[in-house]
Structure formats: C-alpha cells, structure tokens
C-alpha cells in the first residue's frame, strides 16, 4: 500500500533531516534556515501519519496535501542551503532526490484517492 511506503520513507527522510539539522547547527553554526528545514522536513511524515489515522479518505487526502506542501517547502530550504554553500553538491543531491521521491509518492497517492489516475 502506497500510504505505508510514504510513512516509511517520510520517517527515514525525517531522520536524515534531523541529522542534517544537527550538522548545520553544530558544524556550520547555521540556525535560521536549518530550523525551517527541520520543521518542514519532519512535518511531511507527521502529516502522512495523521492522515493514515483519519476518519475518512477525505481526511487522508487533506493531510497528504499538507504533506505535499511541506515537501515543496523542504525542497526550497534545501535549495537555499545549497546555493548559500552550507551544504555541498553530493549532500544536496542525495537528500533532494529523497525529497523528490517522497513528493512523487504523495502526489500519486492523492491522485489515486481522488480517482484521477
């Protein structure tokens, strides 16, 4: 089931975001962008999990739409961190790819829930 894949991948992604946040704050002394990244990057899975326990398909769909927006915001913070030289190309490419994969899964799931195959 796609939702369980989303839950697994979003949790794994959140753990990567937490590690990146620690690195940015401890090693790079960056506190503003990293805090935004931490908030949005961990919120993806939280919203997916909340939706999985909603009362209806509409609840799940609504939470997945929020997760989708958080995913897009996370991409933005990652781009800024890369373009401002806080993270290097390999770090950026790796975590950004995971973020894009999550986005694809969430978009596909919301389309399926809405019957827009």
What are these regions (language model features)?
Residues 1-46, 50-117:
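Short, C-terminally biased terminal segments at protein or domain edges
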């Amino acid at each position: 089931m796609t939702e369980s894949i989303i839950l697994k991948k979003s949790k794994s992604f959140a753990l990567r975001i937490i590690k990146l946040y620690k690195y940015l704050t401890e090693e790079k002394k960056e506190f503003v962008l990293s805090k935004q990244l931490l908030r949005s990057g961990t919120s993806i899975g939280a919203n997916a999990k909340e939706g999985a326990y909603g009362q209806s398909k509409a609840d799940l769909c609504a939470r997945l739409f929020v997760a989708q927006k958080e995913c897009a915001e996370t991409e933005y913070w990652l781009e800024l961190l890369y373009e401002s030289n806080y993270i290097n190309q390999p770090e950026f490419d790796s975590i950004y790819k995971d973020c894009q994969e999550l986005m694809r899964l969430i978009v596909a799931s919301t389309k399926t829930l809405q019957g827009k195959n």
